[in-house]
């Protein structure tokens, strides 16, 4: 549906806070739930999501998004990055490190059915 409406876009990411994230990357579409975390402040969560997404793209390359499994992993990483940002006060100070995101996801690997 997203690809049909925006057929000139390489991809679309739609975040909706605690309702999760929808994505269309290459020919891969999906919806991921949000992570259940104790929320302190939501400022910067969207920026953090984008930072996590771009971080994964810089490691894997944009062409990797053509693989459905990798596309889901990249969006999962971005979702985790945004979620972790909400667990601390402040927009900048709350930004997690790559190691913090990876540790967070490792603890949820079975729950997600994926690894990053």
Which ranges hold each PLM region?
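Conserved phosphate-binding/catalytic region of the ribokinase-like
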Residues: 1-116
């Amino acid at each position: 549906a997203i690809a049909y409406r925006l057929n000139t876009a390489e991809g679309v990411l739609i975040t909706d806070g605690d309702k999760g994230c929808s994505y269309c990357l290459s020919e891969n579409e999906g919806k991921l739930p949000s992570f259940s975390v104790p929320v302190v402040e939501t400022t910067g969560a969207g920026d953090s999501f984008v930072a996590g997404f771009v971080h994964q793209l810089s490691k894997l390359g944009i062409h990797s998004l053509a693989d459905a499994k990798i596309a889901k992993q990249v969006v999962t990483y971005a979702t985790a990055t945004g979620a972790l940002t909400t667990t601390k006060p402040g927009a900048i100070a709350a930004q997690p490190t790559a190691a913090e995101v990876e540790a967070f996801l490792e603890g949820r690997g079975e729950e997600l059915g994926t690894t990053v």
